[in-house]
Amino acid sequence: MAPIPGVMPIGNYVSLYVMLPLGVVNADNVFPDKEKVEDELKQVKAGGCDGVMVDVWWGIIEAKGPKQYDWSAYRELFQLVKKCGLKIQAIMSFHQCGGNVGDAVFIPIPQWILQIGDKNPDIFYTNRAGNRNQEYLSLGVDNQRLFQGRTALEMYRDFMESFRDNMADFLKAGDIVDIEVGCGAAGELRYPSYPETQGWVFPGIGEFQCYDKYMVADWKEAVKQAGNADWEMPGKGAGTYNDTPDKTEFFRPNGTYKTDMGKFFLTWYSNKLIIHGDQVLEEANKVFVGLRVNIAAKVSGIHWWYNHVSHAAELTAGFYNVAGRDGYRPIARMLARHHATLNFTCLEMRDSEQPAEAKSAPQELVQQVLSSGWKEYIDVAGENALPRYDATAYNQMLLNVRPNGVNLNGPPKLKMSGLTYLRLSDDLLQTDNFELFKKFVKKMHADLDPSPNAISPAVLERSNSAITIDELMEATKGSRPFPWYDVTDMPVDGSNPFD
């Protein structure tokens, strides 16, 4: 259909969701504040938002024992969201709540899993010093039958199947539009390399998390197969959580990370993470195939030390991203196999807001990661990393959702599929803050009225054939990101291009 002169094409519309509070369903599996939440949801709806995102906690739903799922509180919540005319993005939260930036609630993974970990702590990610991290199960146990007859992947699958079956009415009605599948700490596809619970503070480089016995055994087999059985994982030369790159043998310029052994380790470490994501999303695709719903995975925004030659903080988190090697496009290629969306974070951040000593570059990181997704022809969505209520942050997010601006003749070539704002709170709903937020929502929608027709997921198709390591390696070849405008063409305090 030809564009109508003077009318903004609907293809410029970017859906806007708001994250619900972490404990909206509490640790006792109760939805306690129905009246308060209903009032807040009505304000969100009146503000023009399209929907909400909510963590669906494994530690709440399967708390009583294996396959003993209780969805009653979440059904109450979803019914209320539907009543208020909002769509739902549901996170399959297989991680612990608590221990990360912004966590004001504590919800552990199921207690019966933790009890297995008491006897076998190697089910958890482990650093070189032997410290265990109970936020999420090690990818080393993905296929280990250690959980009362099930593997970790089977537990994730069974949880998602139960969600699908118990929320079938919401899925069929189109109320649930996105399923974000947790693949690591904080629900992100990453290693828990920077845990505040173990003393990490920004901008520490973090530590590698591959010293549980299952990952160590995998490493030993990998180096043996490569004919280098004497190669070892990084030792103390990789430093500790709060080191800077230049203080370490591994990450300093021309450090161990550039040697053959260092490159082999980083390739192995990052590939294990991608394969983990691939296996989890394979299960998710099988569960939700044939439904009108998007599946997604979130990638962490490790923006500190991006401007250091070694990208140390990215490397410890599992993103092998250095000059001439793209650490994110292989992830996008893996997601493309499953018809999944790449969800990224730190969209609100500007380089100038970061401390110089952190060599942080969130703007360049966002540009690289979003470009990687678009080059693999997948949908890209995102969120802010920290709560912000100011025009500067909103305008940065508006720039990133349409990096080359609106297109008056149809959909822009570069456009994010949606943005989720972190987070619904009393601060957001404070009068002045919410008035500016409503302007932000309007600009996300390209000055169009809220449109349910803009949110219509296609039927999820079955995953494509398995991806080979060679195909992943081909995706690491560095290429320039797409160009970005310097500023958004639709600022919160400005007009639209038709005015």
UniProtKB/Swiss-Prot annotation:
Its top-level enzyme class, in one word, is hydrolase
Positions with a binding annotation for substrate: D55, H95, D103, K298, H303, T345, N384, A385, R423
Q: Provide the reaction this enzyme catalyses.
A: Hydrolysis of (1->4)-alpha-D-glucosidic linkages in polysaccharides so as to remove successive maltose units from the non-reducing ends of the chains
Phylogenetic classification of the source organism: Eukaryota, Viridiplantae, Streptophyta, Embryophyta, Tracheophyta
Keywords (A to Z) from UniProt: Carbohydrate metabolism, Glycosidase, Hydrolase, Polysaccharide degradation
Residue spans making up a coiled coil are none
**Entry's EC annotation:** 3.2.1.2
**BP GO terms, sorted:** polysaccharide catabolic process
Q: How does it assemble?
A: Homotetramer.
Explain the activity's dependence on pH.
Optimum pH is 5-6.
Q: Name one GO molecular function term.
A: beta-amylase activity
- For this entry, the protein name equals Beta-amylase
Q: How does activity depend on temperature?
A: Optimum temperature is 50-55 degrees Celsius.
Annotated family: Belongs to the glycosyl hydrolase 14 family.
Q: Which InterPro entries match?
A: Glyco_hydro_14 (IPR001554), Glyco_hydro_14_CS (IPR018238), Glyco_hydro_14B_pln (IPR001371), Glycoside_hydrolase_SF (IPR017853)
Transmembrane ranges, per UniProt, are none
Q: Which organism is it from?
A: Ipomoea batatas (Sweet potato)
So where's the catalytic machinery, residue-wise? E188, E383
